[in-house]
Amino acid sequence: MLNYVLKRLLGLIPTLLIVAVLVFLFVHLLPGDPARLIAGPEADAQVIALVRQQLGLDQPLHVQFWHYITHVLQGDFGTSMVSRRPVSEEIASRFLPTLWLTITSMIWAVLFGMAIGIAAAVWRNRWPDRVGMTLAVTGISFPAFALGMLLMQIFSVDLGWLPTVGADSWQHYILPSLTLGAAVASVMARFTRSSFVDVLSEDYMRTARAKGVSETWVVLKHGLRNAMIPVVTMMGLQFGFLLGGSIVVEKVFNWPGLGRLLVDSVDMRDYPVIQAEVLLFSLEFILINLVVDVLYAAINPAIRYK
């Protein structure tokens, strides 16, 4: 297992290098001139040229790329074109709000999604199944920004129970986490139901029932563990999606996280911040997939030897 983990970690290097090349080319293909945006609408051509020189944008593209990649390999992601702060500081100040929002969203999404999925599988083709799957389809189909605005209108504007924007207290996490986790809970519910339906028809489940074991214990002990392997895969993918896909929710709730930072950076063509964030999101996905593979071995020890 240790050798497998080390090989996967070494595989990070070429993957991240490819991502670094692609994101560098992508940001330089974006329309708009960062120097003009930073200099302001009133700036003349001389001022814009001076700003472009200060940012290093007057150099040939291959020179810019070499400067960028050599600094990245040294752990230096440059300086933000807008704030003039190191990119690492910009990301560090926004990382924790996004991480806590993601964890909060994932916890309730997994709990509710798995509960709905298990209930739908156990009472298949009956009213719990129909109600649960209707809710799941609705959660997947409803756009996140629309759900966020609806929740704000009801619980913040009309009822005045919860704050609308910011991340100062635990109450600020409720509406954004519900909005962000709704689609994930829906996916988890459908995936858990599908996995459990297959498990419930296995021979060992019928054997456990024949021995007189209660249905609740059969489902929780024998069914849950064997149904968890594909569900864990989906959990890992969805966690990565939440970390990198919270852009819309963070924008709606004015959340001080990485998603909003990325949107603001794209608006201002802040190349160093965009490049660093995309690399960070790629690294997160790779590490999450590695953690999922390790969790397989914890759930089913037989996988360790394959």
Swiss-Prot record:
Membrane-spanning intervals of the chain: 9-29, 103-123, 135-155, 169-189, 229-249, 279-299
As for membrane topology, the entry says: Multi-pass membrane protein
Q: Which residues lie on this side of the membrane: Periplasmic?
A: 30-102, 156-168, 250-278
One Pfam family, short name: BPD_transp_1
One GO biological process term is:
transmembrane transport
Does the entry feature the keyword Cell membrane, yes or no? yes
Q: Which UniProt keywords apply?
A: Cell inner membrane, Cell membrane, Membrane, Transmembrane, Transmembrane helix, Transport
What residue stretches are annotated with the ABC transmembrane type-1 domain? 95-292
* Localization in the cell: Cell inner membrane
Q: Which residues lie on this side of the membrane: Cytoplasmic?
A: 1-8, 124-134, 190-228, 300-306
Keyword field contains Nuclease? no
Per its UniProt record, what InterPro entries does this chain match? BPD_transp_1_N (IPR045621), MetI-like (IPR000515), MetI-like_sf (IPR035906)
This entry carries the following GO cellular component terms, namely: plasma membrane
Q: What does this protein do?
A: Part of the ABC transporter complex GsiABCD involved in glutathione import. Probably responsible for the translocation of the substrate across the membrane.
PANTHER family referenced in this protein's UniProt entry, alphabetically: DIPEPTIDE TRANSPORT SYSTEM PERMEASE PROTEIN DPPB-RELATED, GLUTATHIONE TRANSPORT SYSTEM PERMEASE PROTEIN GSIC
Could you give the subunit structure recorded for this chain?
The complex is composed of two ATP-binding proteins (GsiA), two transmembrane proteins (GsiC and GsiD) and a solute-binding protein (GsiB).
Give the UniProt family note. Answer: Belongs to the binding-protein-dependent transport system permease family.
What is the recorded name of this protein?
A: Glutathione transport system permease protein GsiC
Please tell me the species this chain comes from.
Answer: Salmonella choleraesuis (strain SC-B67)
